[in-house]
Amino acid sequence: MSNLSRRNFVKGAGLASAAVAASAAAVPALADEAATDVVYPEGLQASDFAESPVELAPITEFAAEYTYDVVVIGAGTGGVPAALSAVEEGATACCLQKESAPLSQGGTSTGIMLDESDEQGVMNHMQGFIEDCHWRADRGLARFYYDHSGETMRWMEVRSMEAGFPPYSIGEVTFEYEDGSKCTKRSNRFGPKPYTNNELINALAKLAEERGVDFYYSTPGVQLIQDESGAVTGVVGKTEAGEYIKFNATKGVIVSTGDYQNNQSLVERYCPDVKEFDRKQVGKTGDGILMTMAIGAGFVPVGHSHMMHDFDSGPMFNEPFLTVNENGERFMNEDAEFEQLNNELRYQPKPGWYSQIFDANYVDQVTEWGGRATDPEKLEIYMPDIEMDRSVESGAGVLEYLIDTHRCDTLEELAEALGIPADALIASVERYNELVDAGFDSDFGKKACYMKRIDTPPFYGIHKHIRVSALCAGMTVNANYQVTKIDGTVIPNLWATGFGAGQLCGLPDWSMYTGGMSAGHCMTSGRYCGIAAATGKYEPTTPITDEDVAAAGYDMDVIHGVK
């Protein structure tokens, strides 16, 4: 596939060699400013643009010009569904992508099944999410998710089957409340690892291209275009050769470029909690945030949510085993939520890195705590020193380059395997055992029921690496994902999706109240922004139903848990 699309809607002889004048209102805030004297949008500075392709100086000469109804910036979890949904509604659409291929993360996506729930149950579940977010959630965006995510999950099931990469597992859970109401959620799991949503979105992009979407790879969006009224009328893309392409959008532009975790300048000011942590993703430099702020959009207030975890080094996360840092020293009360461990880890010698330590009795201990431990044989899947077939066909479900679990006969050997000082680890275990025998954790106050001696070989260690998976806040939007100015007024014909849009959660640590909500809300906002841009309405012409899902080849009894 070439960098530019095979199908263009506006072509003119000699256009590639002729300069095309841009609208004088392309970047109103920078009118009359020389390129060498750029005025930065409120809240931004020069360093914010150092890692991003976004340009502030007005671009007025183009190598080519194309016109579509809908232009999507970013071919990811939100962008590809947006573009495909737009063409399904009869619009012409293209998608600009900074990378040479679509890019996505995660594996599970979840939606709320309105027709299998009742109104009170849905409200109860949504209220539970808002309370879990300590009342910091954006209720409007939450409502959008609850209203539209169920249909989106069904749409993804049908389209992914057509694309040749359906979920390997689909399951529903029904919550029943004391008032007699109920709410059902459905989760699609794409994989198993090493396959993820990335394979899904790449397959979906091929389907979208077959159905009329033009993709422009290695062509980032670098500047939004507006008319004299302030409405967005297009975007400027930049090719690998450094040429500017003008993409006119007669109905709207959808920004779906992801978060800003790889823009260290923005991170240090807007999410300094994570500035010392490693990042899981690449290329997420806040391009959409910068582009929209350049035409007057706001950035949601500081206090941005972040998603930080490690589900790859080993299979256990919330078990309150002894935990040590890279110096081999205990540093916390281990009775903590996994998604919040970063709050302790940011103060450690190597932020994000730690090891869980336990012994041969761990299965009985976890069972006593009310959990379900991974048995020793299955734990071996995560041990890099044990050779076995970990291919996707094996069903191992791991990313082999990230597994980091170890089993040794002595603590000295375990320390070497984990890469931490043996004397420090031994001292930490000895001190821990003393506290267990005393019946009171005078160092960190962990409950006595979670204090268990570590004295029976073999000894186990899981070397964990907490990194930034996502920064879950972006440009200001309203409850319909329309981008807004700092004063709250809508910028016409401009939408944004996913984590780059608003702040759904609001909690410093992304809420795990509904597993799969992160990818689910990216897909949902993408699909429905594509529909809205194409039709002006937030409802598909032909909503996908379970009858469509069944017709696509799924066993509905399995999905509904009947068998």
Set out the residue ranges of the language-model regions.
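Extreme N-terminal leader/targeting segments of oxidoreductases
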Residues: 2-4, 8-69
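N-terminal Rossmann-like FAD-binding beta1-loop-alpha1 element of flavoenzymes
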Residues: 70-94
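Conserved N-terminal glycine-rich FAD pyrophosphate-binding loop of Rossmann-like flavoproteins
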Residues: 99-120
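Glycine-rich active-site loop/strand segments that organize a redox cofactor
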Residues: 113-145
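Conserved redox-cofactor binding core of oxidoreductases
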Residues: 147-243, 264-265, 436-456
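A glycine-rich dinucleotide-binding beta-alpha-beta segment and adjacent secondary-structure elements
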Residues: 223, 424-508, 512
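Glycine-rich loop(s) and the adjacent beta-strand/alpha-helix scaffold that form part
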Residues: 240-243, 248-311, 515, 519-528
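An anion/pyrophosphate-binding glycine-rich loop and adjacent beta-alpha core
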Residues: 289, 298-417
